[in-house]
Amino acid sequence: MGGILALKKDDCHAAPTHLLAEDGSYNTTFLQKYLPQTKIDLICVAGRQQGVVSRTGLALAELPGRAFVNRQRGSGTRMLLDFELKKAGIDPGSIPGYEREVTTHIAVALAVKSGEAEAGLCVYSAAKALNLPFVPVSQERYEIAIRHEHAGDPRVRALISAIRSARFREILENLGGYDTTETGTLREVR
């Protein structure tokens, strides 16, 4: 959410976003709400696998009663977790540690690896980096939102070029948990 707010204030030319709306769509709802008069270009970075990381292969339905580590309120991962818990009929209050927040995917995986938590929600690549079991929950759409008036800026053009490169796709595929089918595609939001 911070990236979209920075775009709104024109503090940046581009911001990463993976915000899930209540209708199951990604990013456009929030851009239309917070930047209704601004033309935005969205460039797809990748589809990104989010799931439950644990030491024992826990699934989402097994989280009640388990020590959990969460992402911060307002993050795309937290929004995804809340969406999936609601869909599954799981009360967040039944998950000890739901209010314990960290700010990165690797911090979630490290808390699990160290035994501080039994589970958390993170991207596959963070679980893979620490050799932890991962049970997929959802694939999210990870994009870069660009104020259209800045699309011609050489720095923005360099960013788009890098995202569209074969080397970038190769890096994502080697990390694991990324679907590069739509990497580099552009869509407009008004």
Question: Where would I find each of the regions flagged by the language model?
Answer:
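Ligand-binding cleft/hinge of the Venus flytrap
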Residues: 10-11, 77-100
